A protein has these predicted regions:
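Non-catalytic beta-sheet/beta-sandwich ligand-binding modules that flank or precede catalytic cores
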Residues: 1-190
Length: 190
């Protein structure tokens, strides 16, 4: 107590039974997220601890607007590595296929940063520590990114895949998705 008197010991044999119990029914709510396209990951922050092992990555959709995302401006993740700890933050590391789809879409762009980077998800995305589903974040009320890190690593040519002599077309493979409109064949040496 305040006078530094020790508390009385209560043994297991003399333990007191609880007289009333109110379970936690308050769902966790997302407060924001960081998008790091250079590292290929996002970190979502919640109002209370969530169980990272309950994360369903395929319930996450990235979109270009908080409300009414365009068809080209939204993408639902298919897979990814997730943090499994009990925490107020969940880290999702994108699989290569999803990361390339994100980079080729019209959202979370280098030009607009956080201004076109929103997130929505269903109630089955994650549970809190007591098993309560997260508050639904509808596509009509997306959570805005709070921090954005652009992918500033240039793609590298991985392989010369094939050459079609009849059409004069070549196929090249790169380390990540590229914008074909920026390709300058005059700078290519065979």
């Amino acid at each position: 107590d305040v006078d530094e008197n020790a508390n009385q010991v209560v043994t297991a044999a003399s333990a007191m039974k609880v007289t009333g119990f109110t379970p936690d029914t308050t769902p966790p709510t997302a407060t924001g997220f960081t998008m790091n396209l250079k590292a290929g990951e996002m970190i979502i922050t919640f109002t209370q601890p969530v169980d990272g092992s309950s994360v369903n990555v395929d319930q996450l959709t990235l979109q270009d607007h908080a409300t009414a995302p365009t068809d080209a401006g939204s993408y639902t993740l298919t897979a990814g590595t997730k943090s499994s700890a009990l925490s107020t933050e969940v880290t999702i590391t994108f699989v290569e296929a999803d990361l390339n789809k994100i980079k080729e879409r019209a959202f979370c762009t280098k030009t607009n940063g956080i201004d076109d980077c929103y997130l929505s998800f269903s109630a089955t995305f994650v549970d809190d520590a007591t098993g309560v589903d997260v508050s639904v974040q509808l596509g009509t009320a997306g959570v805005k990114a709070t921090v954005y890190t652009a992918d500033d690593i240039a793609p590298e040519l991985v392989q010369f895949v094939r050459y079609n002599q009849a059409t004069g077309e070549i196929t090249l493979s790169f380390t990540e998705v590229v914008d074909p409109a920026t390709f300058d064949p005059a700078k290519l040496t065979l």
